[in-house]
């Protein structure tokens, strides 16, 4: 019996909507990464982008466990002397909740050119409204 090799023309992409209200950041990011990479499909192939589109709604209502709101720090550097900046997770969730979710999902995606294609299929929105209502057919029920 021969091994079946997936071709790019065989890949069918679905749209998954994940409601993040009241859910933990890591759980939402892990679920989104699974759908984005296509690991939930029986024809998963590492060298092809066989994942689905993911829409995450209610990003402002996401929760974290423990003392992460006060203790978890996000770092960046501008490249100039004295350009080191750091922000707490609690402050970022108030100002840029989309960045927090995108950053968490990005950490769970492969760090190569295929990872950039995979991450392009992620759509995150602060509220419950999103412009992809006509494409979405699958609503995630995992919690």
UniProtKB/Swiss-Prot annotation:
Gene3D superfamilies: Ribosomal protein L13 (3.90.1180.10). It comes from the Bacteria. The keyword Membrane does not apply. GO terms for cellular component: cytosolic large ribosomal subunit. Signal peptide: none annotated. The keyword rRNA processing does not apply. Keywords: Ribonucleoprotein, Ribosomal protein. One of its GO terms (biological process) is negative regulation of translation. InterPro entries: Ribosomal_uL13 (IPR005822), Ribosomal_uL13_bac-type (IPR005823), Ribosomal_uL13_CS (IPR023563), Ribosomal_uL13_sf (IPR036899). GO terms for molecular function: mRNA binding; structural constituent of ribosome. Pfam families: Ribosomal_L13. Belongs to the universal ribosomal protein uL13 family. PANTHER family: LARGE RIBOSOMAL SUBUNIT PROTEIN UL13M, RIBOSOMAL PROTEIN L13. Part of the 50S ribosomal subunit. NCBIfam families: rplM_bact. HAMAP family: Ribosomal_uL13. This protein is one of the early assembly proteins of the 50S ribosomal subunit, although it is not seen to bind rRNA by itself. It is important during the early stages of 50S assembly. This is Large ribosomal subunit protein uL13. The gene is rplM.
